[in-house]
Amino acid sequence: MRQKKVCSLCCLCSLCMNSKEDSLIRNLQYFYQSHPSYLTFVQSVASGKNHTISLRILDWLCTSYAKRHNVVIFQKDRVLHLHTMYKAFLSSHSKKLFDAFRRRQRVQVTKSGVILGDATESEDTLFISTIAQLMFFFWCYERGIIEYAEENVNAIESDLRSYVKEKQKEPSAMVVHSKVVVDFD
């Protein structure tokens, strides 16, 4: 008797995905197909070829800079606190579905959409990414974070450099070797 074939796509195929993940992928595919110029931008940032902003800058902006400097984004008639938005979206989607970096199962991004499964590059592959990274870029686009990052890239980079410098100056835990004699009378 043959065994049932087990999916090797790490919960990214329609057999394994829950309805939330499935609808998320369909929405992402629709978004990126209808915004090809933004897909080109995502490709340049994800591959490190964008000379204005990087993944590290975007991540730093959302996770640390926004918290330290109370960054607000103005959208239509609303004022949104960036760090609070980021934390709320992260808690509702988890790192599995929302992450600036490629830490999970890879997917192929082509001109025709996102291809799940084996992420080996083919002729029509634009770049390799993850669903979580594509969701992060979609979130940044929808909230105007990319524009904010491009306008304030020098301040964000400076803050990141000064933070790294501060961390390097902090003394690390020191191990002190000495003899101790304990006498019990």
Residues covered by each model-derived region:
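Residue-level signal for the start and early helices of compact helical domains
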Residues: 89, 136-137, 175
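Alpha-helical bundle/repeat cores within regulatory domains of eukaryotic proteins
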Residues: 120, 128-139, 159
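Intrinsically disordered, low-complexity regulatory segments in eukaryotic proteins
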Residues: 121-131, 170-175
